[in-house]
UniProtKB/Swiss-Prot annotation:
Domain notes from UniProt: The N-terminal region contains the highly conserved SGGXDS motif, predicted to be a P-loop motif involved in ATP binding.
GO molecular function: ATP binding; tRNA(Ile)-lysidine synthase activity
Predominant subcellular localization, coarse grouping: plastid
Gene that encodes it: tilS
Record-level GO cellular component terms: chloroplast
Function noted in UniProt: Ligates lysine onto the cytidine present at position 34 of the AUA codon-specific tRNA(Ile) that contains the anticodon CAU, in an ATP-dependent manner. Cytidine is converted to lysidine, thus changing the amino acid specificity of the tRNA from methionine to isoleucine.
Organism field: Mesostigma viride
Family, similarity comment: Belongs to the tRNA(Ile)-lysidine synthase family.
Binding site for ATP: 29-34
Keyword list, A-Z: ATP-binding, Chloroplast, Ligase, Nucleotide-binding, Plastid, tRNA processing
Protein name (Swiss-Prot/TrEMBL): tRNA(Ile)-lysidine synthase, chloroplastic
Keyword tRNA processing in annotation: yes
Subcellular location(s) of the protein: Plastid, Chloroplast
Length: 310
């Protein structure tokens, strides 16, 4: 138990995840991961003088999620921590829609109550599952990075994941050792959800028939991708600034000599600015790239993007 406190405390310091006097909103479902997170942050709170709050999102998928929400409210009351509950008033048809709804509502609660950090209970096992989920649905290197330690939202609030170096197995043992109460969500067992299929079918198959240490291999690969993608993003931003200070002719000559990887990133950024993220897929980026190559003497890159928006 002491080892896990120490390990997570060390990760918070090494990755500069949280600061003294932070106002932290803990996203909690009632499962072992979020209950563990609440316990750990409450124990560390005196050292950091954090101001803690708890938020729970009820997707209304089943009876167990409602029971979990009720129990989380009781825990918050017992700990004298501010509690916020959000219940959906319309049916969330899939995991992606549920995730979008959940993050938006939590951000709204955090912003309106002046929390500067949202903490989630995503762990090392979630990171691996998210890697496969993103990879199998089709994504870029940036998209396949999986879960990051921290991410800034447009509101200025940071999402922080202090359990990313801790496995679900470690959290399970932690919960058992100190007898924490649990209210499992039965939706986590349903194979209707793709993430559950990855957890219950794909990963056990890979461990058995390909590599028993596949979790560690993927976790290391996710870290490498993150670091390399961070570097590429910085390079792209520098080139983007240089590119659009010049005239149309300078832009064409400059782009002509860019590596394809950077060219794709430049196009992706322009699509996001001029159109929307919904247009940012491999097919659209490649169509614009090839069209620009054929017509670079005639049109600027921005004009090519406008053609595809009509």
């Amino acid at each position: 138990m002491i080892f896990l406190y120490s390990k997570i405390h060390k990760d918070i310091i090494i990755h500069n995840l949280l600061k003294k006097n932070d106002r932290i909103l803990i996203a909690a479902s009632g499962g072992q991961d979020s209950i563990s997170l609440i316990k750990i942050l409450v124990e560390l709170q005196p050292q950091w003088n954090w101001d803690l709050g708890i938020v729970n999102c009820d997707h209304s998928w089943n009876q167990s999620s409602r029971k979990g929400s009720s129990q989380i409210a009781q825990i918050a009351q017992l700990l004298n921590i501010d509690f916020y509950q959000i219940v959906t008033c319309h049916q969330l048809i899939n995991e992606e829609k549920a995730r979008e709804w959940r993050y938006q509502k939590i951000e709204d609660i955090a912003f309106s109550n002046k929390y500067n950090v949202i903490v989630t209970a995503h762990n090392a096992s979630d990171r691996i599952e998210t890697f496969f989920f993103n990879l199998l649905r089709g994504t870029s290197i940036t998209g396949v990075q999986s879960l990051l330690w921290t991410r800034s939202l447009s509101s200025g609030i940071n999402i922080v994941r202090p359990l990313l170096n801790t496995t679900r197995f470690e959290l399970k043992n932690f919960v058992k050792e100190i007898h924490l109460p649990l209210w499992p969500d039965t939706s986590n067992q349903s194979l209707f959800f793709k993430r559950n299929r990855i957890r219950k079918q794909l990963l056990p198959y890979l461990r058995k028939y390909f590599n028993p240490k596949v979790d560690k291999v993927i976790a290391q690969f996710a870290e490498i991708i993150h670091d390399e993608s961070f570097y590429m993003e910085n390079v792209t931003q520098i080139i983007e600034k240089q590119l659009f200070f010049g005239s149309k002719n300078i832009q064409q000559e400059f782009i002509e000599n860019l590596p394809i990887a950077i060219e794709r990133r430049i196009i992706k950024k322009m699509i996001e600015k001029k159109l929307s993220e919904n247009h940012c897929n491999f097919l659209n980026i490649e169509q614009i790239r090839f069209f620009f190559q054929k017509n670079r003497k005639k049109y600027s890159l921005l004009e090519c993007i406008h053609f595809f928006s009509n």
